[in-house]
Amino acid sequence: MDLSAVKSTGLSGQMHGATVLDSADQGLRPCILWNDTCANAKPAQLYGSIVFPRLTGPKLLWIKHDKPNLFDRIFRTFLPKDYLRLRLTEEPASEMSGTAGMSWLDTGPKDCRNKIFAVTGQDMSYMLHWVGGCEQSGAVPASFREQKIG
């Protein structure tokens, strides 16, 4: 398949998964999907508000409390589709709805919920590019478009 003919692509996908990466953007474990029940109600209590345990934030708290050696190696966390965007564009970005669905974005002022980041230990400075669902969020680099697949 000749990728040079590709003009655009769209990402839509499964939300509430936790794709955890190290500082070299290598996956540290298989993605924890939305239907995984590893996180229980206890992490939600730490937030000070009701948070559905299957969202991404509580999953990170589960890793922090039950797998501390793994948690210490996490540099950043993406939703599965945002991980694909990172691989396609080499740019970290997320739709506001996706980040809000992680329980990390307050959609009113479009700001991170610092209390939640304090609990999970995550630093969202790498994820300052939030876009609307219909906005362009990046460009596929020429090096990717020049690849031949198949």
Where are these regions (language model features)?
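Active-site phosphate-binding/coordination module
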Residues: D2-L60
